[in-house]
């Protein structure tokens, strides 16, 4: 059985995620077909672009309901960048838009100005250090190194306990989130060197453990 299904809904960074899985030796498919995705053991939801556009496509294709159902059935899910934001209740981007609602919280834009009135660059692009807050199988054996971010919006969590690691960019940015079989990274692990690859490898291990169980 194929290990991981990378969900293709037209807005994902599919090439770099696929290449990362190849480097890890993990069997995978890239597909937007629900029947194909139903046969894998774990899912990755990548994403680049607008929250509103992404949710529109996921709803129209039936993938939103498929993802919710798969998670409810115990299938591991990893959201990357926009894909992580989509896991939450809603986003303010281009007007309030309902997300997948798998984790509590909302997505808001960086203010672009500090509390002292100093402007800073949005989007946030570059390498920032992770700070771990809670243990998780996704972070077992992973170092608190630097990872690569590209985003203008960040998650304000409804429950602090879902924040496994954070980074700082004027505000405290949830960088790794997780609860039960739902995980997310705001950064691009596939572009984040050894630290990012170790996190992806841990996710593959989570999926593998489920298969062997």
Curated annotation (Swiss-Prot):
Residues 3-213 form the Glutamine amidotransferase type-1 domain. It is found in: Cytoplasm. InterPro entries: Class_I_gatase-like, GATASE, Imidazole-glycPsynth_HisH. It catalyses: 5-[(5-phospho-1-deoxy-D-ribulos-1-ylimino)methylamino]-1-(5-phospho-beta-D-ribosyl)imidazole-4-carboxamide + L-glutamine = D-erythro-1-(imidazol-4-yl)glycerol 3-phosphate + 5-amino-1-(5-phospho-beta-D-ribosyl)imidazole-4-carboxamide + L-glutamate + H(+); L-glutamine + H2O = L-glutamate + NH4(+). Its main location: cytoplasm. Pathway: Amino-acid biosynthesis; L-histidine biosynthesis; L-histidine from 5-phospho-alpha-D-ribose 1-diphosphate: step 5/9. GO terms for molecular function: glutaminase activity; imidazoleglycerol-phosphate synthase activity; lyase activity. The keyword Mitochondrion does not apply. Its EC number is 4.3.2.10, 3.5.1.2. CDD domains: GATase1_IGP_Synthase. GO terms for biological process: L-histidine biosynthetic process. The keyword Zinc does not apply. The active site is at 81 (nucleophile), 188, 190. Gene3D superfamilies: 3.40.50.880. Disulfide bonds: none annotated. Heterodimer of HisH and HisF. NCBIfam families: IMP_synth_hisH. IGPS catalyzes the conversion of PRFAR and glutamine to IGP, AICAR and glutamate. The HisH subunit catalyzes the hydrolysis of glutamine to glutamate and ammonia as part of the synthesis of IGP and AICAR. The resulting ammonia molecule is channeled to the active site of HisF. This is Imidazole glycerol phosphate synthase subunit HisH.
């Amino acid at each position: 059985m194929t290990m991981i299904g990378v969900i293709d809904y037209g807005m994902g960074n599919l090439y770099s995620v696929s290449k990362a899985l190849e480097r890890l030796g993990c069997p995978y498919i890239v597909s937007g077909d629900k029947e194909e995705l139903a046969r894998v053991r774990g899912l990755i939801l990548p994403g680049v672009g607008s929250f509103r556009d992404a949710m529109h496509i996921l709803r129209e294709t039936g993938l939103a309901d498929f993802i919710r159902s798969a998670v409810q059935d115990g299938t591991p899910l990893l959201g990357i960048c926009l894909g992580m934001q989509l896991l939450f209740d809603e986003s303010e981007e281009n007007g309030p838009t309902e997300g997948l609602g798998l984790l509590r919280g909302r997505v808001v834009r960086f203010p672009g100005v500090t509390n002292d009135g100093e402007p800073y660059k949005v989007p946030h692009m570059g390498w920032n250090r992770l700070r771990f807050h809670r243990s998780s199988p996704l972070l077992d054996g992973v170092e608190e190194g630097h990872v690569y971010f590209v985003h203008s919006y960040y998650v304000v969590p409804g429950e602090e306990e879902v924040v496994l690691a954070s980074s700082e960019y004027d505000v405290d940015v949830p960088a790794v989130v997780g609860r039960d079989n739902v995980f997310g990274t705001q950064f691009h692990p596939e572009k984040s060197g050894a630290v990012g690859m170790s996190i992806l490898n841990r996710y593959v291990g989570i999926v593998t453990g489920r298969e062997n169980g």
